[in-house]
């Protein structure tokens, strides 16, 4: 939060308006460049990242289908329903079967061959997102991945703040590299269902 406060104090209102307009324009340009179809799924938790991407895609004329996965009564399922009461988009939910979950996770670990906890968790989640997309005849799914990496959404950025711009950029490059590697693994998992996972906020143009 400290870095955001300093940025807000540094810029005046007109500067912030310009930054907001430029950011929105760049997000739209990235979506237009990498998203080939008008009907798309959006991996949707109801959080800021997925809600932002969903709203922008809808405003751009895409036929948005929200895709939510989780265990029954999980936070993501409950919260996504609440948020979509305002968005009112097509919304589909896949509840994870706890009986088959261990087998699925074991299979995915064998495919991606890593002990990295975050990478495993995301690949497992996108296995189910891709399965849901496939059942709806969707082959393109958009995610909001990249917001935390690019806009200092991790505690590591607060810890790096005292090191100045150079240290913050070092942390950002590391976070982005990890995220890009993770999304490559995610697409390997999603390919089982012939689904492509796209990240407009991690495109080379946007970064």
Q: Which residues does each PLM region occupy?
A:
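ATP-dependent adenylate-handling active sites, centered on carboxylate activation for C-N bond formation
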Residues: 15-207
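N-terminal segments that mediate ammonia production and transfer
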Residues: 1-14
């Amino acid at each position: 939060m400290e870095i955001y406060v300093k940025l807000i104090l540094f810029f005046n209102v007109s500067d912030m308006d310009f930054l907001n307009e430029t950011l929105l324009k760049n997000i739209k340009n990235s979506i237009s460049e990498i998203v080939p179809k008008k009907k798309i799924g959006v991996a949707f938790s109801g959080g800021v990242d997925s809600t932002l991407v969903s709203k922008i895609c809808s405003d751009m004329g895409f036929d948005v289908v929200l895709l939510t996965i989780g265990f029954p009564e999980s936070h993501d399922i409950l919260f996504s329903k609440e948020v979509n009461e305002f968005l009112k988009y097509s919304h589909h939910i896949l509840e994870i079967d706890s009986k088959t979950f261990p087998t699925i996770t074991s299979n995915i670990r064998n495919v991606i061959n890593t002990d990295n906890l975050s990478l495993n968790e995301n690949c497992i989640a996108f296995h189910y997102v891709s399965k849901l997309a496939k059942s709806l005849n969707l082959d393109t799914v958009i995610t909001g991945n990249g917001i935390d990496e690019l806009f200092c959404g991790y505690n590591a950025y607060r810890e790096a703040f005292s090191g100045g711009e150079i240290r913050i950029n070092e942390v950002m490059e590391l976070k982005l590299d990890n995220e890009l590697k993770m999304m490559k693994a995610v697409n390997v998992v999603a390919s089982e269902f012939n689904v492509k996972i796209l990240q407009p906020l991690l495109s080379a143009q946007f970064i």
